[in-house]
Amino acid sequence: MKLTVLTAAVVLFAAGFVGPGVGMAAAQEQRATERDASDDASDRWRRWRNYNRYPGPIPTPEEWGAPAGPIRIGLQAGHWRAAEAPRELRRLRYNGTQWQGTAEWEANLAIAELAGAQLEALGYEVDILPAVVPPGYRAHLFIAIHADGSDSPAASGYRVASPRRDATGRAEDAARLLRDTYGAATGLRNLPVQTRRMQNYYAFNYRRYEHALHPMTIALIIETGFITSAHDRRVILDAPQRAARGIVEAVKAFPITALPRR
């Protein structure tokens, strides 16, 4: 009997059995390692959150002033020329939606060019911008033009958002106008939910990216409709002039970009 117990003990020891004291020490060491990893992750998150490449200080809304010169409007065709994105924005090279061979950027560019032509005819200076904006881009108003996509063909409607961190203090006023004028021009449904991705749009993020707007550029982003929705495609693909008109009317109505009456 004693021989049997001894043999079992030897087998357990040879197989790597450890007593309760050793096991507890290993568990404590594991927990300490996990805490260190968690602390490292928290430190990385704090550094990322507080990172600021803008050569500050960041202006306040009270310090806002319009750019010198004629009223300039920047219209960004979302995802257009995204393959040219620099390393800091390399993820742009691989996103964007499509519908049966029509890429999102094609719809965005068509709307941007139509709106730009109408605005230039009214006397505005207009820049049609690709996915990557010039560093520190300055304009009276910047509008990023995009289209949504969904696995559900029932998803329909448009969204407008202003930056979560708006140094101008004026972007949400412009966003409200665009929600109204775009809906009136297109007949599409306004979706009141603004996604975090829209509010934290990379072109707004001058703290993190070199290729971002100047903090004093009033900025908006519009998802003009769902390219995956037959209802919305009647506007954004089949009648982009209606989408363009909705954008133009907002520019005209916004007090900062309204042309003086002749």
Per-range role (PLM):
Residues 2-262:
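Catalytic-site microenvironment of enzymes
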